[in-house]
Amino acid sequence: MANKHNLCKKRSLDLSEESTSESHAKRQCTENLFWPEGEDDDSFFSNAHLEDLLDGRKEELFGTQATTSTNKMTQSGSDDGLGLFADTSFPSAQSVPPNSASKPDEASAPTDKHQIDLADEENADKLFKKINLNDLSIAEMEDIFHGADDFSDPMVQNTQLFLDAMTFKKPKTPEKLLAPLKDDSMSFISKSVIEGLVQGTQYVTCEELKNQSLLDPVNWETQAFADFEKNNQDIDKFPSKGEFYGLPDKVKKMILEHKGINSLYEWQDECLNLPAIRQRKNLIYALPTSGGKTLVAEILMLRELLCRERNVLFILPYVSIVQEKVSAMSPFAIDLDFIVEEYTAGKGKCPPQPRRKRRSLFIASIEKGAVLMDSLIDVQRPHEIGLVVVDELHLIGEKGRGATLEAFLTKVMFLNANIQIVGMSATIGNLSEISSFLNADVYTRGFRPVELKEYIKCGPDLLEINSAGQTLEEIFVPSRSVEYNYSEAVKRADPDHLAGLISECAPEHCCLVFCPSRKNCENVALLLSRIVPKHKFFEHRRSEKLDLMDALDKMCGILSPVLAKTLPYGIAYHHSGLTTDERKYIETAYRFGVVTVICCTSTLAAGVNLPAKRVIIRAPYVGQEFLTLCKYKQMVGRAGRAGLGEAGESILIAQSKDNLLVGQMLFSPMDKALSSLDQNEAVGLQSLILSVVGLNLAECRRDLNRLVNSTLLSVQAKSLEVAVNEIVLRILREMFKNKVLQLAEPQAKSKINSSDIITSQDVSQANRPAGDRRLLIGQSTPFKLTNIGRAAFKAGIDYKRANAIHKELKQAQQQLILTNYLHLLYLVVCFNSNERGDELFPADASILFGVYTSLPLDSQAMFKQLGFTEAHAARLFKTQSVQGPLSLQLNRLYKVLILADILNLLPIPSVASKYNVERGTLQHLISQSTAAASAIVRLCEELEEFWCYKPLFERILHKMDRCGTFELEPLMELPAVKINRARQLYAAGFQTIGDIARVRPSHLVQSLEHMPLRVATEIVSAAKIILMKKLDHLEEETENLKDCLKTSDKN
C-alpha cells in the first residue's frame, strides 16, 4: 500500500502558502468554473451565477477527498447520501455476497414515476426492468441501430474463454527485472514486454544510450540524479531573474492565477533541474498521459524568452490545440512583454517580422512550423530561435506528417545553430533510437498524478489487471460479475451493459466511452440516452443543459438532431464530423460537469485533455484496425482527475472473437516510432532533399549523404532493411530527369572522378541515339534547384505535385474566367486533389446535377471549359453516377461549388446539408483549401510567368481564412473567433480590435450571450496581443528610419 500511495504523491514543491486541500479545491474551481471577477459576472453558457454552478457541488469540490483502496472502487454519493447503486465496489476474489450490503434509508428515495426506488435492494436489481425498448416507435429504434457497427459476440464471452486464449503467451519476467523492486507500480505489461517501457525514474544521457540498445527499468527509489554536479564547467549560464527556476516571481503567481496550480509535482522539479536543461542539451522526456508534461515545457519556454531573450518555436499536432495554446499563453505574453504568434494554415508571416525589443513565441502546427523554420534559414536568421519544443514527439512515426516532422528536426540538427530541442512524448518502444537521432538525453518516469485501475470485461465478468502479477491467474484477477437484470429488450440493445457501467459513475462523475467509428459514437450516445435512468440523468443540471443546447443552436448555427436527443441526459458524442466550435462547447460543458458522458473516437485521447472518473473502451478497434498498446495507454490515461485525489478506472470490453488479439496487444512491446521518409515512393525524403538544396544546406552528393545519414531513417536503416544511399541516388536521378535539379556550373568545367559518378539518361535531348549522352555527377559536383524546383520547395510540396499544379496553372492562364471565384477555386482544389478527385468525400451525382442546373450561365461556363456538355449532364442525371471520363473534374467541381457557397457567406450547417457532407469534414475542406491557396501564392512568387496569379490567390486566401464580410474581418483575426461570434461582437458594439482590447472580460460576459469568463479573458488578451504586434512593427519601422538618418548624417 505504501508503494501504491507513491502513485498519488502530492506535489512536493510548494509555490504558495495555501494548504493542499484548499489549493486543490481552488484549482478545480479555477479550471472548471472560471472564477468571476465581480459579483455581476456571468459564467458558462447562461446568465447563471457562480452560486448556481456550485449548487450541489460543494461537497465534491471542498469536501473530503475520494479515497481508494486496492480492491474497491470508490464513488461519491449524492447529497442525500444515496448513489444510483447501493454498492458500487469491486470485491476481490473473496467477494462479498450480494445480499450482505446494507440498505439505504427508504425515506430518502426519489418518488418520480420515471425513477425506481433504490432504497430497496430488490427493487435496485430491477432498475432496467422499468425501461422497455419495445415501447419505442419503429422510427426511434431505427435511429439507434441504423448503420451500427456489428459487435455481436459469436460465442458467449466469459472469463475462462479469455484466459484460455491468453495461454498463447506465458508471462516471463526478464532477467533485468528479477531483482526485487520496492515499487509495485510496475505494470505487468512492462514485465512481459521487456523492451522500451520504463517505469519509475530514469535519466540517461545520449552518450550512455549509444552503448545500450534499450532503457533499463528503474524503481522510484533510484537516485538517478546523484551526479548532477559533475561537469559544472559545462553548465549553461544564463541571467537569472528570480527564484522560480530563474524566472521572475510573478510567473509563479500567474501559473496559480491562470492554471490553478500552486505547486509542482516532484518529477517536474527533477526534470527542470536535469543536467540536459542546465547544460542546454537536447532532451526527450516521456511520461504517461496526464502526467503534467506541458507545464514543464511552458516553464522552459518562458525561461528562454525572458532570461536568454531568444525566440521559441512550439510545435503542436493539431490546429485546434495550437489555437487553444495561443489563447492560453496570451495573458502571460501581455504581463511578461513578449509576442505570441499563431502559425496554422493561412496564418503567420514567413519569414516573421524581426523584432529588437520583444521576443516571440511561435506556436505552430507541424506543417506550418516546418515552413516557418525554412523561411528563417532562407534569410539567414535561424539563430533567432533558441528553443524548439515538440509536443507528441512520438508522432514522428506517423505516416504523412511524421516525415514532415522528421525532416524539420533533421534540418534544425544539421544547422548547428545552438538551437535546443525538447521533445515531449508518450511512452514508446524505441526512445533510444529517437535519442540517437536527436542526440538527446532521455528522462522517463512511470508517474500518474492519481491511481489508475484497469479492468477487462469478458461477458458479465470484470477482471482486474494486477500490476504485480507473475502468472496469468495473478495478472487477470476476477473482480465481480455485473448483472443489472435488464429487460429482454434492453439486453438485446445493450448486451455489453454499457448503460449499467455508466450509470454506476455518471452523472455524479464523468465518463468517456471510446468507440471504433464516428457512426458508432452517435449510435452509442443515442442508445444510452434511451436506457439510462431517465430522472437521474435528465434532472442533473437541467437548466445548464438547456443553455448548452441554445448556445450550440445560436453560436454554431445548428443543433445536431442526435445531440438534441442526447444532451438533455448529459450525453454527447465527439468526433471530427462536428465543427471546431461544436466540439469546444461540448468539451467546456464536460469540464463543467454539465455533460457527463461523451462517446468519442480515439482522437480525443491524443488531442484534448478531458479527464474522466471512468473510461470505457467500447471495442478494441480504431476504425478497421485493431487497437495498439500505445493507443490503449492513451485512452486509459484519461481516467482519473488530478487535484482531488480521484482514482481512475478503465474498462476494456472484449468479445470472444477478439480474445487472442487483446492478449497479443496487452503483451506486445510498446509501439515504435518508425521513420516514414521512405514511404509512398520516398516522397518525404524527396521533399527533404528538395528543401536542403534550396536552402543551400547541401550543394553536392557528399553534403546530401552527410545530412541524410543524420535522419531517423538512417538510425533505423538496418532494422528497416533500407539502403538509404541507394534511395538518395534514385531520387537524384529522378530530379535531374524531371528538371528539378541542374548543375551549378557547366559540366565541362566540373572536375569529376570517374570512380564516384552516377549516370542518368539525359531525357531532355530529343532525336538522339540511345545512350548518346550521359550526365556525370561526382561526390563533390555542385548542383542547385531549377525554377520549378525552387517553386516546389517554397510551396512546401514535392516536385511531382509542383509539376501537376504548374500544368494546371499554365492551361488556365490562357482562358482564365474571372467573372466569379469558381475558376480560381478549381485551381485551389486541384492542389490537394488525388488521382480521382474524391479525397475527403466523393461527389453526389444527384446533388451535383441539381446544383449545376440552377447555376447562372456565367457559372456554368466553368463546367463547359472543362468539357462538361449538356450530354454529360443528361448522362449524369440518368446514371446518378460521376464515373466516367470526367469523374476527376466532376469530383473537383463538387468541392468548388461547396467552397463558392462558403465564400458567399452561406452558413456552414446549410452548406453541409445542401451537399450532404458532415460539418466537420466541410470545415476540414476549408482549412485544407486555405493552406493550398497559401502554398500556391508562394509557388507563384518564384515563377515570373505566373505574376498575374499572386494577387488573385492572395484574395482567395484572405476570404477563405476569414469567411466573413468586410466589416467583420478585423474581428476574425482573433483566434477561435468565427463568423457567428464576430457578428455577436459587432452587434454588441465591439467593432474593432481596439474596442475589445479596452474592455474588461467581465463586461464582455455581461454584454454577450453564451460567453464564458475564460473565453472572454482569452479574447481580450488576444486583442491586446494583436495591438502589441502592430505597435512593435511601428516601433521597428521607427528605429529603422532613425538608423537610416544616422547613416546619412555620418556620410
Curated annotation (Swiss-Prot):
Disruption phenotype: Impaired meiosis, leading to maternal mutants with eggshell defects. Mutant females produce ventralized egg shells, with phenotypes ranging from fused dorsal appendages to fully ventralized eggs with no dorsal appendages. Mutant flies are hypersensitive to chemical mutagens. Its EC number is 5.6.2.4. SUPFAM superfamilies: P-loop containing nucleoside triphosphate hydrolases (SSF52540), Sec63 N-terminal domain-like (SSF158702). The gene is mus301. It catalyses: Couples ATP hydrolysis with the unwinding of duplex DNA by translocating in the 3'-5' direction; ATP + H2O = ADP + phosphate + H(+). Its main location: nucleus. Residues 1-28, 61-112 are annotated as: Disordered. Single-stranded 3'-5' DNA helicase that plays a key role in homology-driven double-strand break (DSB) repair. Involved in different DSB repair mechanisms that are guided by annealing of extensive stretches of complementary bases at break ends, such as microhomology-mediated end-joining (MMEJ), single-strand annealing (SSA) or synthesis-dependent strand annealing (SDSA). This is Helicase POLQ-like. Belongs to the helicase family. SKI2 subfamily. One of its GO terms (cellular component) is nucleus. It holds the Pfam family HTH_61. The lineage of its organism: Eukaryota, Metazoa, Ecdysozoa, Arthropoda, Hexapoda. The keyword Transport does not apply.
